[in-house]
Amino acid sequence: MYAIIETGGKQFRVKSGDIVKIEKLNIEPGQEVIFDKVLLFKGNEGLKIGNPYIEGVKVKAEVIDEKKDKKVLVYSPPSKKAIHKLKGHRQWYTKIKIKEIVGG
């Protein structure tokens, strides 16, 4: 049994027990979060596809941690002058553990 959820403008295929890195949520570690934007659900009865979301199916997860990801370097080469620009960016993410998929 698995589901495809949407959060933070991205889609993730999850099943019970998975650990997933998603965009930052403003929720403390240890708290429960419920995702109701389920795009697809595959269970024992078959496949359900939402239009755009499936009503009655929710994914329960627990927030494990909130950290910064690895640094991404952005380099701007010089145009006509010898001015180099090198910048770094570290994106915040939230690590969650999927508890169960309810409904379906």
Curated annotation (Swiss-Prot):
Origin: domain of life: Bacteria
The question of whether Ribonucleoprotein is a record keyword is answered with yes
What keywords tag this UniProt record?
Ribonucleoprotein, Ribosomal protein, RNA-binding, rRNA-binding
What the entry lists under SUPFAM superfamilies is as follows: L21p-like
Q: InterPro entries under this entry? A: bL21-like, bL21-like_sf, Ribosomal_bL21
Any one GO biological process? translation
Cell inner membrane keyword on record: no
Q: Which Pfam families is this protein grouped with?
A: Ribosomal_L21p
> GO cellular component terms?
cytoplasm; ribonucleoprotein complex; ribosome
Single Gene Ontology MF annotation? structural constituent of ribosome
Task: Read off the HAMAP family from this record.
Answer: Ribosomal_bL21 (MF_01363)
Describe the protein's quaternary organization and the partners it interacts with. Answer: Part of the 50S ribosomal subunit. Contacts protein L20.
Q: What does this protein do?
A: This protein binds to 23S rRNA in the presence of protein L20.
> Per the similarity annotation, which family is this?
Belongs to the bacterial ribosomal protein bL21 family.
Query: Could you tell me what this protein is called?
Result: Large ribosomal subunit protein bL21
Origin species: Thermodesulfovibrio yellowstonii (strain ATCC 51303 / DSM 11347 / YP87)
